[in-house]
């Protein structure tokens, strides 16, 4: 169990470390989904509401539904003000989405999979930036924690869908 706990702790830190190390893309370049071992990252330009709408449309086109949007920026901005600290984001949302058929198959394969559900996208704008960054954990990376061939197969399918969703958004926005 210790190994799994360490792996899960590493999973939570990796998005932060990767994003701190990333540079921004050049103006006018074709936006594509950046793939690391752990993450899928897309950066686009535009108002966050347009990006969220494009994401919701793409999610529905892949037969998923949006389970909710957590507006972390509102709460964290108030908390930062209470502590007298700066808040480094103009916007920070977590968009949750799910495909019920795949969720059912996954939970039948391993009920522990529920700890990783639903799919989530961090959608944020750094203070003063015109770019919106969208980040997802790679389902194939997370699925390794469960060591189930069926879960890994489903994770590959979900990951292909997440990449397709991000590619649709990249095609629709600058």
Can you annotate each of these PLM segments?
Residues 55, 62-66, 80, 166-173:
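Sec/Tat-exported extracytoplasmic proteins
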Residues 128-138:
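Short, well-ordered strand-loop elements centered on a beta-strand within folded domains, enriched
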Residues 141-157:
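A short acidic/glycine-rich loop-to-helix N-cap element
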């Amino acid at each position: 169990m210790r190994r799994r706990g360490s792996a899960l702790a590493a999973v939570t830190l990796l998005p932060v470390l990767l994003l701190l190390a990333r540079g921004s893309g050049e103006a006018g370049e074709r936006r594509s989904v950046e793939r690391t071992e752990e993450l899928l990252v897309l950066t686009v330009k535009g108002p966050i509401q347009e990006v969220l709408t494009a994401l919701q449309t793409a999610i529905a086109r892949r037969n998923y539904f949006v389970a909710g949007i957590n507006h972390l920026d509102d709460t964290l901005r108030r908390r930062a003000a209470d502590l007298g600290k700066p808040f480094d984001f103009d916007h920070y949302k977590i968009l949750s989405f799910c495909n019920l058929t795949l969720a059912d198959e996954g939970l039948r394969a391993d009920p522990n999979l529920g700890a990783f559900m639903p799919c989530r996208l961090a959608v944020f704008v750094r203070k003063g930036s015109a770019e919106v960054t969208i980040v997802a954990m790679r389902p194939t990376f997370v699925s390794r924690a469960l060591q189930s061939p069926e879960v890994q197969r489903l994770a590959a399918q979900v990951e292909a869908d997440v990449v397709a969703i991000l590619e649709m958004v990249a095609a629709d926005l600058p």
